[in-house]
Amino acid sequence: MASPIIQPAGAGIHDIFTQLELWESIDKGLSMITILRDNDVLWKPFLQLTLFNQLNIVRKAWSATIQKASESDKVPTLKDVYTSESSFIAQALLDTKNLQITPPATPRTALSGALLAKTIVIFHHSERAQEELGTELPEEVRSLVNQNAICLKVLYNANQWHIDLHYKRDSLSSAQAGEVAEIFEQYLEEALEAVASAIPPSPPVEDDNAGHGGLCKERTDCPKVNRCIHDLIEEQAIARPDQEGICAYDGSLSYAGLSKLSSVLAEQLKTFGARPEQRVAILMNKSFWYPVVVLAVLKSGAAFVPLDPSHPKNRLKQLISEIEPCALITTSVLSELADDLGCPSLAIDSDLTRSKEGSTTALLPNTSASPNNAAYIIFTSGSTGKPKGVVVEHSALSTSAITRGVVLGLGPDSRVLQYAPHTFDVSVDEILTTLIHGGCVCVPSEDDRFSIAHFMESARVTVALLTPTSARTLHPDEVPSLRILQTGGEVLTEDVNDKWSNRVTLFNVYGPTEASVACVISNRTGLKGAGHVLGQAVGGKLWIVDPDDIERHLPDNEVGELVISGAILARGYFRDPSRTESSFVRMRNGERVYRTGDLASMDSAGTIIYHGRKDLEVKIRGQRINIAEIEIAILQCDLVHSVVVEYPRSGLFEKKLVAVLRFEDSSSDAEDGLFGGAKGLTEDIYCLLLSHVSSVLTPAMIPSKWLSLPCVPQMPSGKADRKQVRGWLEDMDKRTYTRIFHPNGTDNLISDPSDSMVAIWLKVLKLEPQSLRLDQSFIRNGGDSIMAMEARHQAHEAGINIDVRELLGSRALQEIGEMATKTSAVEEVSKIEDDRDEPFPLSPVQQMYFDKVSDPSLGLQQRVCVEIMTKIQPDMLREALNHVIQKHRMLAARFTKHMGQWMQQVPFGKNLKHLSRCHIYSQAVGSLGDFCSEPMALEDGTLLHAHLQSSGERQTLVLCVHHLVVDFVSWRVILQDLHDALAAAQNGLPSGISRSTLTFQQWCREQTKYASTLIPEAVLPFAPGPVNLRFWQPSNVQAVSNTYSEIVQHDFRLSSTQTTQMLEKFTTATVHPTDLMLATFALAFKRIFTERDTPTIFIEGHGREPWHASLDVSQTVGWFTAAFPIHLPKDTLLNTTTAILGASERRRSVLANGHPYWACRYLSPNGQKVFGDDPRHQEMEFVFNYAGSIVQRAPGQTLFAENVRIAEIGHPNCERFSLFDIGAAIEMPSSELVVSFTFPKGIAHRERVAELVKTYQELLETAVERDLDLSAKLSSPLVCPADVVRSLEVNGVCIERDVEIVYTPSSIQQHMLWRQSQEPWFYRVQGDWTIEKTTTQSEPVDIDRLSHAWNQVVHRHTTLRTVFRYSSEEERFVAIVLHEVKPAISIIRKGIQTSGSLCRDDDLSPPHRMVLREKDNGSVVCELEFSHTIIDAASRSIVVQDLLDAYDGKLAHRPLDFPPFWEYIRLAQSSTPSARKEELHRAGRVVTLPFQPTHVLSKVPEACKKNEITISSFFMTAWSIVLAKHFVAHNQRVDSTSSQAVAFDYVLSDRSANIPGIESAVGPYIRLPTLETHVKEGVSLKNIARGLHAQCTFQSLSQSTQDGSSLELPSKATALQKYSTLVNIRNSGSDSLDLVSDSGEWKWILQGFSDPWDYDLVFAVNVHAGKVTGWTVEYADGVVEHSAADEIAKDLNDVVERMVCEII
């Protein structure tokens, strides 16, 4: 084919591009659609934006197009795949698993999700377009482009943009392509119109780049947005009046409410004289009122000036005196402080019309501001000692807010955190920029700011601007709603960048207050490293100049001063023309620039890099602070002669303000050198200075460290030599630091640096133990508010509660620590008893040992070999070992059989003192295996043996201990304590014994108690696979010998490089190297042994997971090891990625690394019963243990060589625990992963096992070296049992395409599903409503419209799109949430007896149905039926109300502001339930005995109020009395001295869980707790009721969702009486009894309702609007006799009447 004709250089951009694309289209089978071809007017304002903003608009419009066209709920991500000098290519990737199942109704324009999953966007810069035509793209890029059916091609230059959409004709029809193009044009046009409305027409700006070198590489500055801030916000209020504008801890406001309140207040402010260029001060704490006040001041025409109530009163008075405001707006809480400031004030409370001056609020003449009037004044620190007020005009902030909002993607769906103090300019951005873009401002309380994660989650914050220091205290998992994080105010450090860059869209922002908050932005998403790169200009122009000559622009990459120009610049400093003139400079060409004082450089692309400051200004936690202002304040003290304040960047004073003083009475002679005379301040002088500076400086400006010098070093000019002082501070060593601040040494109050609170102080304050003063406050020790937040977080992790406000007060750390301990004590487990001189139970792994080993004395030993670096004597070693044994008495334990059960005992007192606890050998041994090869006597022998072997100057120590008393972790403790004892002996010091953690005896005792509380069904989320030991038995052998003398071993290793890659790639929040090794082993096994399923693997762990934070066994010696089974079915092993994800999902779902399972299996009677006879839990085919690094020596153990060898050796005749042992460890010092397979040599398939090991190695190495894309799927909860996957596929359901989520239902749901599988009438909720017209003029009910409305409701709620399947392989039900379902709806029209569309019970129908019947009178009967597995009583009201709204056309406009049900399960379920097949007895049909209402019903609420009990407690009391009468145990008489114990379950709503929006969610949010109480004859009914009410209240609070026990199986309380009974107080869902549509034309009337529960007797009470409407007694026919049930119902009626009469 002929080549295209290339036009000459003068050809227009459109002609060149058209010819190029025409040729490509013919050649490649493409067709083309031009976007917005003839609309120059619309493009013109767009061309005034920066290139950064232009590209962002196009990219966002294309992302929105893909999302809408594919009907996805996910926004596509654009990933750059190619970049050259003048073009780049991006690929839009869409997560297709959320696309709908069924196609749209019009197949002609239907778009397949696969076609839109990957699309290409190509950008060309037109000035290089001809050169690009002959440029070959890399092969992989061309291949990637050709794989996409749709390509958007963009050609641009400074004066013109041209966009074409290309599509493959064999993949898309012209109609389909046209639909995509139409959607894209719509979004692009809306964006261009928004730009046009924000940027009014302006004359073209001359291109002055030629004269300004580095001046703005791509664009002139952004045109001025000549609008008032409040006008832009009012436009949003008109556009979205009902949308939430303010969401605060103390209230919320819609945009309409915000507009109305601010307008009323603005009129009041005018009576105070508010008008343009006048000032209004605001003195308020955080509140929803503050944004109202800010907007009101702007509407009044004045400028607002925020003041901080926490600042010193003298400073506030100084500011008030300077700005002379016409009014001061405050709150009643701060009114006393406001009165002292001497300014007319207005207190804002709920009544806006109340004024202290008694002024009227009549509407006054309009005094609105213009865009050039002042909008606000922010005061920053000043070098003269006087704060300087930055005056910012409306147009400056409007320009900045609009341009930055476009870059950040702010919009109506943005919920922005208002975190910064009001006196920071960032708060202006958080409030006004958010409102300008139609978002919601989320305002925490002052206390919330110290634990901000909780507020961010509850307020559903999506955008935040934090300093890197503040961002460091948060974790991405704590704020799942956060989508955009901006960091600014400080240099973005590497750790903060790496923590967030892959979890949110991360921006680094820069800008002084003088440039309207921010003017440089860098997108750090996905990038690593520190953020010294500030980014590119947004909203203005920036360039680099010579600090001594700003007219000289510096070349690219040269460091100079950063200057800013453009419409975003502030007016200047308030009433300070000299400082304004020096900072805001007019250049020779007339351009006005601001000199930032920041040193920076700019590269050829316009990217700015920060290099520090040229003056004395520093940023502390985002606040600009001028050092000179602090120094001036300190010099006002008479006793200070001179001062230098520094902010060191490294060393012991890193990022702390340090004041270096010379006092008036000090000698200037430096006898000990320049800094030799440095001293700390006495307490009196420190308090005097602190009192003074606290009265004039803000808290952030007060130095945290103070010291004095005989003289301050000076330069020849006479000025202080700051560089020398700073260098001395940064280089100061610990010895000098201690001499200055702790000269007496004895003042140090630390007795134990390992104390948990002390450890927190040391870590957070970054101090050495000798530098921490517990007798001083947190602030006095160098702390600040950010450190206080970090300390609170660290304490919380340690199970300790501390109050941030106390930390920031004057209390000493010692006192705070004592208070914290007392506060936390109520949350700890009951006091743990001390060790006793008596036998105590075994740990689970010890019990397993005695169960499996026929001769326990043969058993296992662990041996450690370490080289001694400094020679020791045997006697010294003996004493050191005796010291270790005295500290860890388990090393001298004895094992005895007591009544057939093995127990253990440790020696006490004299027994310990005189016991020969260890044997020391000195003769040579051949090898480590030869030493101590004889069995150890468990009952009366020695369990610790040591061998000290000398060879010349070298000594080697070998320690051998019976495995029953140690594990791998124990050796780290033993070696450390042994080293310390030897070191103390060499130095002639005594060896102290301290026990900071539990003893092994205490752990075993508490563990046995804990195990008794565990439920076997809840400790293991996935059932093990079938065990198949016979597979390994040779046909000619009766049994395979599995002892340590009959084993063989195969090993392989990964190189150090591969090992490093493994640790880096597979050590994340969700993936562990264990997952990789398990997954690749399973894949290898599947490949080699094709004839059988993959085996269950028991994962071995250290077993030291505490169930409460107060249990610390980190320094305890004993055998703790635990294990749990995991099975990766071969059908789920599709590839390496899915195998790793499956292993990760199953491993992480097991609570506490399997410790609860292990404890339950061996220590719990129920666990022994459930697991004891199940071979899957008893016979271990494979055991896997990843030990990590096996080096045991700590860095400080200088007596020992670095390399420590450790081995586990079994006696030749000892039985092994499993058939195959797979061990993995990182060997040091080579840093290589070593994997070993150990198995009996007599097994079958030995050759294939060798193949297995080889294949395993290959797969493991390949996985390590490949770049597996795990990130996109780690959050995908679509791991589904293989048999369920197969059943879904039979029904045409694809997991990845059609399923939203797969999760394990709660234990309550599992129980309901089991019961329904046997007797389907249980837990089937039915309600019948009549829907009728309210007037004769009303339109008849449209039955088809009602059916369509129900479809909308079903689509809205995930529980209504949930189907349940049973997995036979894993013996549990699973819940599958489908993207699309077709609900079961039956329509029976007038005169027709059969349904138009039959209700179905097919495999893909959720468990609910609707039947609609038309009546002759125009009404409709609606029958709704649900399984209780998907709704509760409150859900019924929600669903019916949604149906009404959908019928009225209002549902589609309501936000989805409620959580899916599985979020509740994850919070409430202590572990994923494993519901075994329940043995349920047939119960028969449910019979209902209705109660006939009497006058007594109306009196129940009054009786309850009078006695301060709830209606629920009233009726539960009545039920208790009836149960006590009917079910008294045989031979038990109830009299005045005895009481009858009764128990019953009751239905408790669990919508108090701390999950935002749960009150609007649909699902079974219920618990079924058991209430056990005593009914005593002779006690009044009133006292019984009050006691039961208190018991219920305590129980509901103590069994909160947070304790993980919320969703356990119902107990049915059958232990105390014959029948299982339930009390169901139906006070939720009553809103669905009678409903009227908003239009008032028709109403719903409940005709009947049934709700059968699987209990022998159910007492159900209906409560509506606080009134009792009736009750019923329901019983299971065939279990309860009718006569007995009837008698119970009659007695219940009598008891209720008697209770009302007695307690009213």
Swiss-Prot record:
Protein name: Nonribosomal peptide synthetase ivoA
InterPro entries, per database record: AA_adenyl_dom (IPR010071), ACP-like_sf (IPR036736), AMP-bd_C_sf (IPR045851), AMP-binding_CS (IPR020845), AMP-dep_synth/lig_dom (IPR000873), ANL_N_sf (IPR042099), CAT-like_dom_sf (IPR023213), Condensatn (IPR001242)
Pathway where this protein functions: Pigment biosynthesis
Domain Carrier stretches: 748-827
Keywords linked to the UniProt accession: Isomerase, Phosphopantetheine, Phosphoprotein
Domain commentary: NRP synthetases are composed of discrete domains (adenylation (A), thiolation (T) or peptidyl carrier protein (PCP) and condensation (C) domains) which when grouped together are referred to as a single module. Each module is responsible for the recognition (via the A domain) and incorporation of a single amino acid into the growing peptide product. Thus, an NRP synthetase is generally composed of one or more modules and can terminate in a thioesterase domain (TE) that releases the newly synthesized peptide from the enzyme.
Pfam families, A to Z: AMP-binding (PF00501), Condensation (PF00668), PP-binding (PF00550)
GO biological process: amino acid activation for nonribosomal peptide biosynthetic process; conidium formation; pigment biosynthetic process; positive regulation of conidium formation; secondary metabolic process; secondary metabolite biosynthetic process
GO cellular component: cytoplasm; fungal-type cell wall
Spans annotated as Condensation: 1325-1477
MF terms in GO: isomerase activity; phosphopantetheine binding
This protein's encoding gene: ivoA
Coiled coil feature spans: none
NCBIfam families: AA-adenyl-dom
Keyword Phosphoprotein found: yes
Effect of substituting H963A: Compromises the catalytic activity, but does not affect substrate binding at the A domain
Disruption phenotype: Impairs the production of the gray-brown conidiophore pigment and leads to 'ivory' (colorless) conidiophores.
Known EC number: 5.1.-.-
Keyword Phosphoprotein part of the UniProt annotation: yes
Region (Adenylation): 234-620
Protein family membership: Belongs to the NRP synthetase family.
Entry function: Nonribosomal peptide synthetase; part of the pathway that mediates the biosynthesis of the gray-brown conidiophore pigment. The first step of the pathway is performed by the nonribosomal peptide synthetase ivoA that catalyzes ATP-dependent unidirectional stereoinversion of L-tryptophan to D-tryptophan with complete conversion. While the stereoinversion is catalyzed by the epimerization (E) domain of ivoA, the terminal condensation (C) domain stereoselectively hydrolyzes D-tryptophanyl-S-phosphopantetheine thioester and thus represents a non-canonical C domain function.
Sites bearing O-(pantetheine 4'-phosphoryl)serine, chain numbering: S785
Ranges where the record places region Epimerization (E) domain: 840-1266
Highest taxon listed in the record's lineage: Eukaryota
